[in-house]
């Protein structure tokens, strides 16, 4: 990550065992054990990049990492197939005027079928917006619940319960 803020979580792919947590920027914990000057402490404490923040314990919007989840829900509910395509062009789309000025945008137009495979390859926001509408609210929420969203999980550190909405409902 060089000079950027971020975090990594490394887990065993078969067991889910937590192998490593890294938050950057970081600090040298030995400085605390060996004692540090007030100047050093202030430089860590006052750093706008927050090196003492455990970023892996914070809540973040999932962004494009949620696209495979959406695809999996579509496939397991039989709302989507790998062959289903949507028809649209350009980099901006909205369902209808009920969305007001809100548009779904995707970064890069691409040629080829607007299907699940290409949508994952090109991280196509428009495809996944349309797919979610096709899946439907009830199927989508039930699919998330089957994946344990909204449940507390056993974890060696205290973490927030996963959520798919800031309220009790999605529109």
What residue ranges belong to the model's regions?
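Beta-lactam-recognizing serine transpeptidase/beta-lactamase-like catalytic domain environment
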Residues: 6, 12-64, 69-171
């Amino acid at each position: 990550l060089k000079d950027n803020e971020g975090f990594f979580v490394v887990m065993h792919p078969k067991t889910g065992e937590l192998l490593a947590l890294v938050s950057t920027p970081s600090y040298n914990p030995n400085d605390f054990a060996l004692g540090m000057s007030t100047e050093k402490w202030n430089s860590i404490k006052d750093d706008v990049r927050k090196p003492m923040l455990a970023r892996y314990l914070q809540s973040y919007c999932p962004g494009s990492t949620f696209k495979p989840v959406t695809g999996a829900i579509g496939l397991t509910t039989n709302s989507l197939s790998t062959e289903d395509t949507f028809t649209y062009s350009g980099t901006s789309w909205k369902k209808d005027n009920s969305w007001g000025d809100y548009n779904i945008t995707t970064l890069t137009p691409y040629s080829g079928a607007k299907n699940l495979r290409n949508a994952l390859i090109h991280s196509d926001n428009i495809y996944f917006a349309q797919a979610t509408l096709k899946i439907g609210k009830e199927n989508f929420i039930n699919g998330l619940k089957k994946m344990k969203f909204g449940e507390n999980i056993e974890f060696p550190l205290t973490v927030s319960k996963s959520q798919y909405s800031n309220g009790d409902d999605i529109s």
